[in-house]
Amino acid sequence: MPAIRIVHRSSLAPAEAWKRLTDWERHGAQVPLTRTIIETAPPTHVGTVFTARTGVGRITFDDPMEVVVWRPPAAASRGASSGLVRLVKRGRTVRGWAEIEVRPLPAGGTEIHWREELRLRGLGRAFDPLVAAAGRFLFGRALARLLRP
């Protein structure tokens, strides 16, 4: 599976960065031709399921995901801490996992680590470098937009 690793720094506090990065509906708005369908009642928790549906018209594919780790950062009033969410991709077309981790920076702000490994059905390992490059571009752009003031 191609590995996608993105590190991004933000002036936002960890709790605010977390709030923005785990707003699943906003994720769909950042990826071209994609919308997110939340299938579990809020708030997000272990077991939450949602699907990113990408496509045009009747030509679409679904990327169903389940939250398997949900550890939000502590509120700033209790001393900022790291947060981690892990998603497992359970679709027919897209398989793998993704993690988003927020870490407080000593001088304020947050360092975000986005890690993802995915396999696209029908694409052999020869396409891994292309899939990884496209993923870094798309997810990096989505990350920056989600954190934008």
Question: Could you say what each language-model-derived stretch is?
Answer:
Residues 43, 55-111, 117-120, 148:
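Hydrophobic-ligand binding "helix-grip"
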Residues 1-45:
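Hydrophobic ligand-binding cavity/cleft-lining segments
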Residues 36-40, 49, 131-134:
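Juxtamembrane/interface motifs at transmembrane-helix termini
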Residues 4, 36-38, 51, 84, ...:
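Short structured motifs
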